[in-house]
Amino acid sequence: MKSDLAIVILAAGRGTRMRSSTPKVLHNIAGLPMVAHVLRGAQLLKPCKTIVVFRDVRVEQYIRNTFPDVLTVAQSDALYGTGFGVFSAIPWIRSESYGNTYPNTRHESHAEYELDACDLDTCNPASDRLNDQESLKGGRHIHTKSGDVTNNKPFPSRVLILYADVPLVPFQLLEELVRKPLKQAVGAIVTTHLDNPKGYGRVMRDNLGSIAKIIEDSNILPEQSINEVNTGVGIFDTEYLQDALNKLLKCHIAHSPNQDCVTNQDCVTNQDCVTNQDCVTNQDCVPAAHTEAHVLSPKVIVTEQIHKKAESEHQHAGQWMCRQDTVGAQNTKEEMRLTDIVEYFYNNGLRVNSITTSDSELLLGVNNRVQLAKTEKILNDQIIKRWQLYGVTIKSPETTWIDSTVQLSEDVLILPGCILSGRTRIEEGAVIGPFATISDSFIGKNTIVKRAEIIDARIEEGAVIGPFAFIRPGTVIGKDSKVGTFVEIKQSNIGPESKVPHLSYIGDANIGSHVNIGAGNIFANYDGKLKHETCIDDGVKTGAGNVFVAPVKVGRGAYTGAGSVIRDDIEEGALSLTELKQKTIPKWAENRGDG
């Protein structure tokens, strides 16, 4: 059965607090960008469609290259906020497009949208078609300048909303949210309780425990003590979500700082409305249908005194009053927040459920480098615990870092101070460390790697690496071979049971099996312009202090003497010496006067 779930991942935040030229959601934790962690979790839910809303083209490029089945949609630079981000995805939820081959449309302003053929007064709950249940049974139209992309075609009935900068949401929680029926509700959000909720949106409930609204931290009154916070994760009925976002966008446009205060002409027929002369700059219209602090936007503080006055002056639902935007200066970008729909639903008698979790540290977003480090530490602890339960011995979890992309086998031993990253794979019985750094490499069975750095290389079964060896990209170390202390190897093949024990540089070389490279050998592979290859055949024994000037070839079973400089090829089984006659001067030190 095809899934009825669509997933929208919001990745359009500017991330200014990261103080980085890299988009926030592309910052790595445990080997992957934050957005990749979110996408990996989302894909496990097997949705019929996944959409990422982006602003920076680098985010789009990464997703196109890494997750080709994910649709990417550009969020306009003209309007900000999570509400508009989700709104941007609605047409593509309803389209027949699957995967990012569908052309992205960057909407430059809200003027590009034709949001049903109705007036701005539809932001009044009294006239809202959410009250008309029959109107929600069929499809709705959303148009862009490029034409109708929906055409009343069937579309996913539920939308799960995730954030690209919240990478640690447990899959079990998402699974519960998706599988739990909405019943009589139009959606459900995930909440958690914090001892110090400062900086997070608070969940306000009515006397019956129903969620009434989400209040931004800056709008919390001193007497309000609320420690239940909104995590941002939520699931909504697609039709209700679309309808609410349509109306809220209209209100947002109508009440932006560049618009005049709502006049009588803007109000619903036969409804009272406060006129312009009663308004002040940057005022909005708000419904006065409830006695509690329910407004269209949780950006604005509405005191009990204002509502008591509203209750006395306006007794029937759908009437409007002007209010002063007491925090307008704090919201200079005029964001359209997704959280506004919670109050909007409540004002229309529609319920939003909640799932409350105690895993608060897994649901808080990353906004700066401090939170980035904290999040990576949490994820690293999870990764280490998982591998320990799988059968990997990790002697010092506190000093070990393992990327989420690393693969380990049973009975691997990891000693203190190790960093394993990228697409590294380590086979059974390997001993890693102490103080080894391995990235994007294969480490075979029963291999020993101690105090070494290995990058993009392959180490076959039984090899011994280190201490203090540096294995660079493109290197293959054969079975049961040895690379010893202070050896650097680059772009070379070392055959089975060969040894490079100490103090050597091997570059661009092919070394056969059962070869012994003497101490202090240098493969001079660079002529100032080009790199050249050195070939050492099976069974060769080289003396200490040799220099091989590439290109050069040494035949099978040949020997070289200590201190030799090999510039010409050596035939099989030969001995090659660079012989300089030794001259000894008797009593030289005495004659020099050294005493």
Swiss-Prot record:
Record's subcellular location: Cytoplasm
Cofactor note text: Binds 1 Mg(2+) ion per subunit.
Residues the entry annotates as binding Mg(2+): D165, N367
Uppermost EC category: transferase
Keyword Lipid metabolism: no
Region (Pyrophosphorylase): 1-369
Segments for region (N-acetyltransferase): 391-595
Residues holding acetyl-CoA: A519, N525, Y526, A562
EC number: 2.7.7.23, 2.3.1.157
A GO CC term attached to the entry: cytoplasm
Residues reported in the UniProt entry to bind UDP-N-acetyl-alpha-D-glucosamine: 10-13, 24, 75, 81-82, 201, 216, 230, 367, 472, 490, 505, 516
Annotated spans, Linker: 370-390
Pathway annotation: Nucleotide-sugar biosynthesis; UDP-N-acetyl-alpha-D-glucosamine biosynthesis; N-acetyl-alpha-D-glucosamine 1-phosphate from alpha-D-glucosamine 6-phosphate (route II): step 2/2; Nucleotide-sugar biosynthesis; UDP-N-acetyl-alpha-D-glucosamine biosynthesis; UDP-N-acetyl-alpha-D-glucosamine from N-acetyl-alpha-D-glucosamine 1-phosphate: step 1/1; Bacterial outer membrane biogenesis; LPS lipid A biosynthesis
Alphabetized GO MF terms: glucosamine-1-phosphate N-acetyltransferase activity; magnesium ion binding; UDP-N-acetylglucosamine diphosphorylase activity
Family: In the N-terminal section; belongs to the N-acetylglucosamine-1-phosphate uridyltransferase family. In the C-terminal section; belongs to the transferase hexapeptide repeat family.
Assembly and interaction partners: Homotrimer.
Name of the molecule in the record: Bifunctional protein GlmU
Lineage of origin: Bacteria, Bacillati, Actinomycetota, Actinomycetes, Micrococcales
Gene that this sequence comes from: glmU
